[in-house]
Amino acid sequence: MSLSRRDFMKVVSSTAVATGLIGCGSDDNESVAVSFEHGVASGDPTQTQVIIWTRVTTAASYVDVSWQVASDIEFLNVVQSGVFTTDTGRDFTVKVDVQNLNANSQYYYRFMVGEMMSEVGQTQTLPEDGVEKASMAVVSCANYPAGYFHVYREILNQHEQSPFDVVLHLGDYIYEYGAGGYASEDAAALGREPSKGTECITLDDYRKRYAQYR
């Protein structure tokens, strides 16, 4: 349904930084800092399923992340929930394919590690039958050193006035160039120099670049 970088609530997701101490990881690490620094996101909906995502920032070896999906923003009616174990092998990302949802319905979702909680995201499943029309926002080519990232705020502002059904990213969500690469002439002045400063080659390079964009 929706993927975005920071502020969305309806078709995209919201972000916040929550930090605290919680027991996780190994027996030798009784309490470690945990935070949700990369927000939450949802996407790839069907009539009965949707994927929800987040990333945990921590020094632990692994983290058990609880997740909930509810029909109301107060989470008085939780319809699906579970626990997802994430670790360094997946860069502490959490990706859950939530199933057995109702068609054409809005849902709220969140993630928790102990008492620490992510921001609440909002998503929607597809309708059962065809629709006569749909409203969408389309974005593409998000080059960190030169991209017009304020467009995401503008989409949110427009959405609050006239809701979009979907936000569609056509591609080039990140660019792998290093410092001095394509369209990076003003990167230093804008405070948007690419992470690491070199072209992305390794898996770790790409993980850091995606984290920088988000």
Task: Label every model-predicted segment.
Residues 31-214:
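Divalent metal-dependent phosphoesterase catalytic cores across multiple superfamilies
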